[in-house]
Amino acid sequence: MTNLPLWEVFFRGTVAITTQILSNNVVLIMEPVATVKTAAVGFWFPVGSRHEGADQRGVTHFVEHLLFKGTATRSAFDIALAFDRIGGYLNAFTDRESLCLHCVVPANHLAKALEVMVDMVSNSLLEHKEIERERAVIQSEIVSSQDDPEETALDAASEAVWPGHPLAAPIAGSVEEVGRLSRQVLMDWYQSHIVRGPLVICAAGNVDGDFLLKVAENLPQRGVCAKNWLGVARSNGWQGTGPVWNSGLQFKDAPFRQMQFFLQLPACPPVSARDYYCWAVANAVVGDTMSSRLFQKLREEGGYSYNVYSFMTHYSDTTCWCAYASAARKDSRKVVATLYRELNLLKEEGFTPDELEAACQHVCGEEIIAAEDIDYRAKRLFRHHSLGFPQATTEEIVDLIHSLTTEDVAAALNKLLDFDKASLLVYGNRPTESFQKKILALV
């Protein structure tokens, strides 16, 4: 008997992913999975907080909320009830470069779900009373987020490396900025970017491709979708500038008991799926797993931190890698010293074959487990599209990860670990001058 690799056993026979650009400029991407009884669909619009002007801060997030507040033929309750009655899930989110309306439903109810979603992105009323009610809700959401140490710190970390740039602005805006948004501004944004703007529809699961195609073809004419998300924005009139990286040591006072540390480094955006997954494997070696260098040194051996991890954030024209840790004030010097020491060791001595094997298996395992989630598959379709990558099945991705060599990952790490470009943000309660000098001596 031939022993097949695990990923071949799981994914042999996957139906091909299809991408179609329709006459109305809608992009339709589908990954049929006949073995499931659910369907996931996302409507993706290439507009986010990054694309807002100074007098429009928070408008995309505000419009996202208003999609649920009623159309010409459905009340907000009707929209909610339509999904509750079928046991489905409908939600939306705004990011810095996109807005997404997405659902997961039993496959036999997909037609009803799409009918409601199309209505929401075509005929929302944005009534004055709903705007004022939701304005208060969003302002409450913003105030609540300011009580979350990690959320406020993440915004501060973005501001540290891209000061004054829209990529660093809070996605929801401030309480004052949301308070200034008029119905006319909201309606203009909705009409320009949601009703008539570029649209990518990503669907995965037990989907009827012919039916989805008919739904997409019946949508009104849209803006042109280019090969990647930056190109889409540019081709539809956005004239924003790219972010300029700001390195160095910064301290920010915050009313929280623990100190938080963000060591950030810039990277070029991945130009291929191979680049993307190479970064993922490198990140797993450094800090993304419990067996990673930083987790072992800062938590398991040092006992300094409960929260230790690293992550990469990809935008259309830049990438940021970040190592994060939180600790008691008394352990601050040890945390910073350990961060720099371990990263320098990785740069000078590299990693072991066992570390690389473990990291590759970890990233493969994540993909295999995540692929059980149809919503994840639909979002992965969009990720590949927005970054300009060819679509790939789980099997193809796992094969790609296993093809990465020690040289591939080492080159990625060496390129990343340029400490002349490092930005360290120390975020916490009353960083005194004496405290700052002690940290400065370590970097």
Give residue spans per PLM region.
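Short solvent-exposed loop/turn micro-motifs enriched in small/polar/acidic residues
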Residues: 11-14, 234-235, 243-245
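Acidic, glycine-rich loop-and-beta core segments that form the ion-binding/anion-interacting portion
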Residues: 244, 256-258, 263-265, 272
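A conserved active-site cap/scaffold subdomain adjacent to cofactor or substrate pockets
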Residues: 271, 279-288
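Short hydrophobic-aromatic micro-motifs
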Residues: 27-30, 252, 261-263
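N- or domain-start disorder-to-order transition segments that initiate the globular core
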Residues: 7-38
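Active-site-flanking beta-strand signature of metal-NTP-handling nucleotidyl enzymes
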Residues: 40-43, 260-264, 423-425
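Charge-rich, well-structured scaffold segments of protease-associated domains
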Residues: 3-5, 21, 32, 76-231, ...
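M16/MPP (pitrilysin/insulinase) zinc-metallopeptidase core fold and M16-derived inactive scaffolds
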Residues: 40-104, 285-304, 315
